[in-house]
UniProtKB/Swiss-Prot annotation:
Any one Gene Ontology cellular component term annotated for this protein: cytosol
Entry similarity comment: Belongs to the class-II aminoacyl-tRNA synthetase family.
Family matches, as Gene3D superfamilies: Anticodon-binding domain, Bira Bifunctional Protein, Domain 2
PANTHER family named in the record: HISTIDINE--TRNA LIGASE, HISTIDYL-TRNA SYNTHETASE
Superkingdom, natural source: Eukaryota
Keyword terms: Aminoacyl-tRNA synthetase, ATP-binding, Cytoplasm, Ligase, Nucleotide-binding, Protein biosynthesis
Molecular function in Gene Ontology: ATP binding; histidine-tRNA ligase activity; RNA binding
Chief subcellular location: cytoplasm
Protein name, per record: Probable histidine--tRNA ligase, cytoplasmic
Entry's EC annotation: 6.1.1.21
Pfam families listed in its UniProt record: tRNA-synt_His
InterPro entries, per database record: aa-tRNA-synth_II, aa-tRNA-synth_II/BPL/LPL, Anticodon-bd_dom_sf, HisRS-like_core, HisRS/HisZ
Enzyme's top EC category: ligase
Length: 445
């Protein structure tokens, strides 16, 4: 029997799951700090819901076989499902997060975290608020999540409204906006010559390509906004609105303390049809080959489009997705070797002492300390220590007949577990908890 996983999918072993779950716990804490609530939606949706939402990316949707009844497809992202949720339940204001698998019929690259099945983690703010307030908080939350990754990153920010003005200024018909944006969005991974060639295949002439190049190659800080305000795009209504939005957004990002991590980059287009305003994307500075690890933007019309063309009920939204699988691919390259949350390994000396170790484990567990031992035959001290080092368990507690008789156990910790302290179980628990909290050990230890 062929035991391969299908192309573009991946098994997650203990180490992968440990790192993945640790990161998801960290970002969930960030979301909840900002008052977000969790929801969940089906893994597959009615096919008609997903149609015409993703531009050129629609070809990547996995369609399920027609078995009679509903015609369904696997979800491409979590955003369209969220819009359906808002529309179905008539929710007008909600700050929500959701974690789940999504599916794309893409050409996979496991080494770069590009798969056909992968985990996404979304945060969205739905509702009408003052200009750019929700957008700024969404980018702030995304920044706080990326802080948990522990590597340098940069956030690129653009605006669909500015891009609309650029298309109009370039003489590009509105029916070509989406496909041209999809090509421009590849600039972070393709040279300009390839971008220009692809634009020409979509019907653009050399003059139009030249105008696009003059703007989409612009990148920088607040000075770019000042330059745009004095340029041709500011004369268009969409251009003026988009540029003024960016100016206000960067003001708010400065207040939140994340403005220094963001740049204006008009090559950022994000190829999805539903974006209407600010768009943003983040990449790890030292792992550019992985691609973007987070991205999102404002989508004010998606909920009404889900309800149908005649609907007047709408909910403006802004949000982002974390590319969890791509982030995991980076963590696997550089992170330490832990596979569990175990804090203490309980070993024995001078005998098997299984029941005695079980008693110690029980007390540690009840005290809220993650601990484990071997339930098989007796292992030598060297083998136990090798296991502790290999799995990066920070503490090694030794149980022997003398320790049991005196109720005084030896705890080894630090580099190569070379440091030691002695005490009863309560004292050891307090020491471990103080170490966990980054505090100085209690006096006398």
């Amino acid at each position: 029997m062929d035991l391969r996983t299908p192309k573009g999918t991946h098994d997650y072993g203990p180490r992968e799951c440990y790192l993945l779950n640790r990161f998801l716990r960290a970002v969930t804490e960030v979301f909840e700090t900002h008052g977000a609530a969790c929801i969940d939606t089906p893994t597959f949706e009615l096919r008609e819901l997903l149609c015409n939402k993703y531009g050129d990316e629609s070809r990547l949707i996995f369609d399920l076989a027609d078995q009679g009844g509903d015609i369904c497809s696997l979800r491409y992202d979590l955003t369209v499902s969220f819009a359906r949720f808002l529309a179905k339940h008539r929710v007008q204001r909600l700050k929500r997060f959701q974690i789940g698998k999504v599916f794309r019929r893409d050409q996979p690259s496991v080494s770069k975290g590009r798969l056909r099945e992968f985990v996404q983690c979304d945060l969205d703010i739905a509702g009408a608020y003052m200009e750019m307030v929700a957008d700024a908080e969404a980018i702030c939350i995304m920044s706080e999540c990326l802080d948990r990754v522990g590597h340098r990153y940069q956030i690129r920010i653009s605006s669909r409204k500015i891009l609309n003005a650029l298309m109009e200024h370039s003489g590009i018909g509105r029916n070509n906006f989406a496909t041209v944006c999809s090509t421009i969005d590849k600039m972070d991974r393709l040279p300009w010559a390839d971008i220009a060639a692809e634009l020409r295949t979509k019907g653009l002439v050399d003059g139009q390509v030249a105008v696009l190049k003059r703007y989409v190659c612009v990148s920088g800080g607040i000075e770019v906004i000042d330059t745009l305000r004095s340029g041709e795009l500011y004369l268009y209504s969409d251009g003026k609105k988009g540029i003024d939005d960016l100016a206000l957004l960067f003001k708010y990002l400065g207040i939140y303390g994340v403005g220094d991590r963001a740049v204006v980059d008009l090559s950022l287009a994000r190829g999805l049809d539903y974006y209407t305003g600010v768009i943003f994307e983040a990449a790890l500075v030292d792992f550019k080959d992985v691609g973007s690890v987070a991205g999102g933007g404002r989508y004010d019309n998606l909920v009404s489009s889900v309800l149908g063309k005649k609907s007047e009920w709408s909910v403006p939204c802004v949000g982002f997705s974390l590319g969890v699988t791509r982030i995991l691919s980076v963590m696997l390259k550089v992170d330490r070797r832990r596979t569990t949350e175990t804090e203490v390994f309980v070993g024995s000396s001078g005998g098997l002492l299984l029941e005695e170790r079980m008693g110690v484990l029980s007390r540690l567990w009840r005290a809220g300390v993650a601990a484990e031992t071997f339930y098989t035959r007796k292992y030598g001290y060297a083998s136990l220590m090798e296991h502790v080092r290999k799995t990066d368990i920070p503490f090694f507690l030794l149980v022997g007949e003398k320790e049991i008789a005196e109720n005084r156990f030896r705890l080894m910790y630090g580099e190569d577990r070379a440091l030691q302290m002695y005490g009863d179980i309560d004292t050891i628990v307090n020491f471990i908890k103080s170490h966990r909290a980054g505090q100085r050990p209690p006096a006398g230890l």
